């Protein structure tokens, strides 16, 4: 299996912006005396997972709908036939699962067992984030096409 198309579909140029908030927030937490390297690493990995998931889902959604057929600029891999829609759909599923697992680890490290209610809120937010990343261009009610 050639990994180069998957790296291209991940759109590496979008990743620095996605982690910038985590870096700034972690720097501020460190400045305030609240720092745990495990939380920083897991937050970075969760954010990167969500961004790659969003990019894969966008490539899949636009490719299936034909939105990228006449695209000018950087080609999208499903539309170009380099990655099949079925392969990209599987990548979206796998990336969703891995990102959710990392997010669960982050929530556990950050809140522990004693803050179950707060953990539950963040688990629901994580599920919502994964759903939003996918629904941007996937499905009949994709919000990326409205307005």
Where do the model's predicted regions map?
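Topogenic membrane-insertion module of multi-pass membrane proteins
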Residues: 1-42
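Residue-level signal for inorganic ion chemistry
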Residues: 10, 62, 84
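Acidic (Asp/Glu-rich) catalytic motifs at the cytosolic membrane interface
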Residues: 49-74
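Intramembrane alpha-helical segments
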Residues: 76, 80-147
């Amino acid at each position: 299996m050639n990994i180069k198309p998957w790296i291209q579909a991940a759109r590496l140029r979008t990743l620095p912006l996605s982690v910038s908030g985590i870096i700034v927030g972690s720097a501020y937490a460190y400045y305030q005396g609240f720092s745990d390297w495990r939380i920083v690493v897991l937050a970075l990995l969760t954010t990167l997972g969500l961004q790659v998931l969003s990019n894969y889902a966008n490539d899949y959604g636009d490719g299936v709908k034909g939105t990228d057929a006449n695209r000018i600029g950087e080609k999208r891999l499903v539309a170009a036939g380099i990655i099949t829609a079925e392969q990209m759909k599987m990548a979206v599923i796998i990336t969703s699962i891995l990102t959710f697992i990392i997010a669960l680890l982050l929530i556990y490290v950050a809140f522990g067992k004693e803050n179950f209610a707060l953990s539950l809120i963040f688990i629901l937010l994580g599920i919502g984030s994964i759903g939003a990343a996918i629904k941007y261009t996937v499905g009949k009610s994709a919000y990326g096409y409205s307005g």
